[in-house]
From Swiss-Prot:
Biological source species: Synechococcus sp. (strain CC9902)
Enzyme Commission number(s) of this protein: 7.1.1.-
Keyword field: Membrane, NAD, NADP, Plastoquinone, Quinone, Thylakoid, Translocase, Transport
Topology of this chain in the membrane: Peripheral membrane protein
Protein name listed in UniProt: NAD(P)H-quinone oxidoreductase subunit M
HAMAP family noted in UniProt: NDH1_NDH1M
Subcellular localization, as worded in the UniProt entry: Cellular thylakoid membrane
Listed GO MF terms: oxidoreductase activity, acting on NAD(P)H, quinone or similar compound as acceptor; quinone binding
Pfam family, one: NdhM
Keyword Translocase: yes
Top-level class of the enzyme under EC nomenclature: translocase
Amino acid sequence: MADTLLKCTTRHVRLFTARVDNDDLVPSANELTLDLDPDNEFIWSESCISQVQQRFKQLVDAAAGGELSDYTLRRIGTDLEGFIRQLLQRGELSYNPEARVQNFSMGLPRTPELL
């Protein structure tokens, strides 16, 4: 499997069975790479990034020992999408007003006027 690159792509999460080497993805059966919010739809604090990385580690650890498949990657990616939505709903994460597109893919911003 070392030559096969598996990937999962959701709106805000991209997962690869690879490591980054000189800005290139090198397939790896033993490593997962997380690309978070590639379209910069959100404004990320260090705390939010850390929380997503922690959740990613928990999900990877929980899947350890099992088959590394497209399905496993999709489950991890989908769970991370849900976690990002929770951060947004709690007000810990916010939409980036400078983003290329304002589509509010995870719901309208939670502001006092809208609550």
